[in-house]
């Protein structure tokens, strides 16, 4: 019999298993059949007895008394052992060491799968409520106040909606077929919201006013055919146009177009600005940029200005934050009153960009913009900065009264000293053009470049009072005949491009007749620029087509010489000016000599050009590259779709429309009342002779918007009073500016330019 000490030695903490391991395997099998309980009871004794019997068979029934006491402890240990061993790969130690990355991936998969499932379930739960909550205007609008466009829908039994070709902050643009006129049109659908409606009504009024004074569509302004309300949306019906000038630039890989083609664009734009400056219009576009200048036809150089959504009349200005940044004039940057001269600044910037392929002043913000202007043009005159509310945003005044640039806060951008980045070098006047790419080309001589540079410097005059005006720009030697007839436009076709298009196709939207396919949108940060025209086109590479662009030329027609008008002060006879644009109508103006405006030259050796884009990125294709076009406000963006056909159906919209934030209204005109600007603002351009009485008013009923500068009577703005002893002065044009056809042709400056419209950004 064992003693108590021996019994104590057999406790679980000190049991010796070696003698009994011979039956351990049998114990495992038996343990699998035993109840898993941590309480010991007499009910388990029979099982223990069975184990003992099994164990005795292995130990020859030796030490039976000891086994009787050890067996309960062995069974307990066996119960704690796993019945089956797990895969080593699932061991926690392995998961947290060798397979740690795999563990993290699994956690992410499980987590995000659950999150995605919950999100989908949540969407499913409120999908029905969402429709009920966000569909407005009896189900015709979405939650953004935009009309829900349905392809193939027919409006008013007249317009068949083809597709959405553009979308912006103002609303949308669709391509539609007009069954009545049997032509393609672009319909601008304004958002169903009061603020957008009000602004669009201003645009409609200005467009109708311009179209009223340009019934023959001679002056390069987009034609508003009609407008109507449809399901609470104001809809503007425009002619269809083609590519914009930014598309053209992009398709030259941003190398720029020839000086010849740049000249043709310049003449048409100056003519358009001259038209806008007529007293009964006095319209400031406020957002000129390449995106807002569209080709009428992809085969011709005729252009039109679009997007008057930001425009205003002189004296009716409502915005202070205007113009795309790259093209923003100094007076706008400095917070000064502005007038029509801001559009001339923008034009100067555009023309340089069209030839060089790159923006002259591509500022990332207003401070950067001003610094880049100063690099080229130097510090603005002190008399301007002294009056500028925002001068100290960019400059600091020294004790001696002079101004210097402020150092940038970040200190990252380093600029060239003021006025040291010469326009002479930017244009490559003596080095074969930009990058030397025009060396040896006809029409790109040093003399040609010197004329171009001089015109640009006059357009980029810091002082809006002395900045060249459209009338005098058209007289510049850059547009005059030279020994090389191919370098200017004076012998180019004088037929109105809009009329040519209409005559050749029967409609003003013929270029869009073959446009088809669905519209595409892609993201432009704008640009596109910004920043921002809605167009749709069917335009693959059309190398053959561009060779035909702008190729017609005609010998100038002998024009009647008008007698000198009465009423000019001074002894000098009035200057007779022949204005020829390609393919614009020839116009003879009789004007008083304005020496200060005609012969002035900017004090700085190089003038500044700045350029602001709508926020919209243009995505170039392949080697074309991308260029961001920042936009001045929450502007519409561009969208396009590319098809295989060559022709282009292009909406007239550049889609830089409404400002998302209304700035303080400014109704006071800037002080621009010098003799030169008087001629600028009041140079009538009409089909018939315009007669002015002593009060300067035409023999027509002027509306409240006509000649607002005269009505406001602001100091510094002459009211066109003529001496009482003189007769009425006549601004004369050739009656109904003749339209001519010709057969002579010159080589197209577009030869070799492969124009392909790639998707433009939309946001």
Curated annotation (Swiss-Prot):
Residues covered by the Protein kinase domain: 159-479
Pfam families according to UniProt: Pkinase
Region (Histidine-rich domain (HRD)): 595-625
Cellular component per GO, a single term: ribonucleoprotein complex
Polar residues bias: start-end ranges: 46-57, 485-501, 634-645, 754-763
Regulation: Inhibited by RANBP9. Inhibited by harmine, leucettamine B and leucettine L41.
Catalytic activity: L-seryl-[protein] + ATP = O-phospho-L-seryl-[protein] + ADP + H(+); L-threonyl-[protein] + ATP = O-phospho-L-threonyl-[protein] + ADP + H(+); L-tyrosyl-[protein] + ATP = O-phospho-L-tyrosyl-[protein] + ADP + H(+); [DNA-directed RNA polymerase] + ATP = phospho-[DNA-directed RNA polymerase] + ADP + H(+)
Tissue: Ubiquitous. Highest levels in skeletal muscle, testis, fetal lung and fetal kidney.
GO MF terms, alphabetically ordered: actin binding; ATP binding; cytoskeletal protein binding; histone H3T45 kinase activity; identical protein binding; non-membrane spanning protein tyrosine kinase activity; protein kinase activity; protein serine kinase activity
Xref: Gene3D superfamilies: Phosphorylase Kinase, domain 1 (3.30.200.20), Transferase(Phosphotransferase) domain 1 (1.10.510.10)
Active-site residues, Swiss-Prot/TrEMBL: 287 (proton acceptor)
UniProt short sequence motif Bipartite nuclear localization signal, positions renumbered to this chain: 117-134
Subcellular location(s) of the protein: Nucleus; Nucleus speckle
The entry's keywords: ATP-binding, Host-virus interaction, Intellectual disability, Kinase, Nucleotide-binding, Nucleus, Phosphoprotein, Serine/threonine-protein kinase, Transcription, Transcription regulation, Transferase, Tyrosine-protein kinase
Top-level enzyme category: transferase
Region (Disordered): 32-57, 115-136, 408-442, 485-540, 596-679, 744-763
UniProt KW Transcription regulation keyword: yes
Effect of residue 321 to F: Mildly reduces kinase activity. Does not abolish autophosphorylation on tyrosine residues
Entry-annotated residues carrying Phosphothreonine: 402
Annotated binding of ATP, by residue: 165-173, 188, 238-241
Connected disease: Intellectual developmental disorder, autosomal dominant 7: A disease characterized by primary microcephaly, severe intellectual disability without speech, anxious autistic behavior, and dysmorphic features, including bitemporal narrowing, deep-set eyes, large simple ears, and a pointed nasal tip. Intellectual disability is characterized by significantly below average general intellectual functioning associated with impairments in adaptive behavior and manifested during the developmental period.
Family statement: Belongs to the protein kinase superfamily. CMGC Ser/Thr protein kinase family. MNB/DYRK subfamily.
Domain comment quoted from the record: The polyhistidine repeats act as targeting signals to nuclear speckles.
Chain's role: Dual-specificity kinase which possesses both serine/threonine and tyrosine kinase activities. Plays an important role in double-strand breaks (DSBs) repair following DNA damage. Mechanistically, phosphorylates RNF169 and increases its ability to block accumulation of TP53BP1 at the DSB sites thereby promoting homologous recombination repair (HRR).
Protein name stated in the entry: Dual specificity tyrosine-phosphorylation-regulated kinase 1A
Naturally occurring in which organism (per UniProt): Homo sapiens
Lineage: Eukaryota, Metazoa, Chordata, Craniata, Vertebrata
């Amino acid at each position: 019999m064992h003693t108590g000490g021996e019994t104590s030695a057999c406790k679980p903490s000190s049991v010796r298993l070696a003698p009994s391991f011979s039956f351990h395997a049998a114990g495992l099998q038996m343990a699998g059949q035993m109840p898993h309980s941590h309480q010991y009871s007499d009910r388990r004794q029979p099982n223990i007895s069975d184990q003992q019997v099994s164990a005795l068979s292995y130990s020859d029934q030796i030490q039976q008394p000891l086994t009787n006491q050890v067996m309960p402890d062995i069974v307990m240990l066996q119960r704690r052992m796993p019945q089956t061993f797990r895969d080593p790969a699932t061991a926690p130690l392995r998961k947290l060491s060798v397979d740690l990355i795999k563990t993290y991936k699994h956690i992410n998969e499980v987590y995000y799968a659950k999150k995605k499932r919950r999100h989908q379930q949540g969407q499913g739960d409120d999908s029905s409520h969402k429709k009920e909550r966000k569909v407005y205007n009896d189900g015709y609008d979405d939650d953004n106040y935009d009309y829900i466009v349905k392809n193939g829908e027919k409006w008013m039994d007249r317009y068949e909606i083809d597709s959405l070709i553009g979308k912006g902050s103002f609303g949308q643009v669709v391509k539609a077929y007009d069954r009545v006129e049997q032509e393609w049109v672009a319909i601008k659908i304004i958002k169903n919201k009061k603020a957008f409606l009000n602004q669009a009504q201003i645009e409609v009024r200005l467009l109708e006013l311009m179209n009223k004074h340009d019934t023959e569509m001679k002056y390069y302004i987009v034609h508003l055919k009609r407008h109507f309300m449809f399901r609470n949306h104001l809809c503007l019906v425009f002619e269809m146009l083609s590519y914009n000038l930014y598309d053209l630039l992009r398709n030259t890989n941003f190398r720029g177009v020839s000086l010849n083609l740049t000249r043709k664009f310049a003449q048409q734009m100056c003519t358009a600005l001259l038209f806008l400056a007529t007293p009964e219009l006095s319209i400031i576009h406020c957002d000129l940029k390449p995106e807002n200048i569209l080709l009428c036809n992809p085969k011709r150089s005729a252009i039109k200005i679009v997007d008057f959504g930001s425009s205003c009349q002189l004296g009716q200005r409502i915005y202070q934050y205007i113009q795309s940044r790259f093209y923003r004039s100094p007076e706008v940057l400095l917070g000064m009153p502005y007038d029509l001269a801001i559009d001339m600044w923008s034009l100067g910037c555009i023309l340089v960009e069209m030839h060089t392929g790159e923006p002259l002043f591509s500022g990332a913000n207003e401070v950067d913009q001003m610094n880049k202007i100063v690099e080229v043009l130097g510090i603005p005159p002190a008399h301007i900065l002294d009056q500028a509310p925002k001068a100290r945003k960019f400059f600091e005044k020294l004790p001696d009264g002079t101004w210097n640039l402020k150092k940038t806060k970040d200190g990252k951008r380093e600029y060239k000293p003021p006025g040291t980045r010469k326009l002479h070098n930017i244009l490559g006047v003596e080095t074969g053009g930009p990058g030397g790419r025009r060396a040896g080309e006809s029409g790109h001589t040093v003399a040609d470049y010197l004329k171009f540079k001089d015109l640009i410097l006059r357009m980029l005059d810091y002082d809006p009072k002395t900045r060249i005006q459209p009338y005098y720009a058209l007289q510049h030697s850059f547009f005059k005949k030279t020994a090389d007839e191919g370098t200017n436009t004076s012998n180019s076709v004088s037929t109105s491009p809009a009329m040519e298009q209409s005559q050749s196709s029967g409609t003003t939207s013929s270029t869009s007749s073959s446009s088809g396919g669905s519209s595409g949108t892609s993201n432009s940060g704008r640009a596109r620029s910004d920043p921002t025209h809605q167009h749709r086109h069917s335009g693959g590479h059309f190398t053959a087509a561009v060779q035909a662009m702008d190729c017609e030329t005609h010998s100038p027609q002998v024009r009647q010489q008008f007698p000198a008008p009465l009423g000019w002060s001074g002894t000098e006879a009035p200057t007779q000016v022949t204005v020829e644009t390609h393919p614009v109508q020839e116009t003879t103006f009789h004007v008083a000599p304005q020496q200060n405006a005609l012969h002035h030259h900017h004090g700085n050796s190089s003038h500044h050009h700045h350029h602001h884009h709508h926020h919209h990125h243009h995505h170039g294709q392949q080697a074309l590259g991308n260029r961001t076009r920042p936009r001045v406000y929450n502007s519409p963006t561009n969208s396009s779709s590319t098809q295989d056909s060559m022709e282009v159906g292009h909406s007239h919209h550049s889609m830089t429309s409404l400002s998302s934030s209304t700035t303080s209204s400014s109704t006071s005109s800037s002080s621009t009342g010098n003799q030169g600007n008087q001629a600028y603002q009041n140079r009538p351009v009409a089909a018939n002779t315009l007669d002015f009485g002593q009060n300067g008013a035409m023999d027509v009923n002027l509306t409240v918007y006509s000649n607002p500068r005269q009505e406001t009577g602001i100091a510094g703005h002459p009211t066109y009073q003529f001496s009482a002893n003189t007769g009425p002065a006549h601004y004369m044009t050739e009656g109904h500016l003749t339209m001519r056809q010709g057969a002579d042709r010159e080589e197209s400056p577009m030869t070799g330019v492969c124009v392909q419209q790639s998707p433009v950004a939309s946001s």
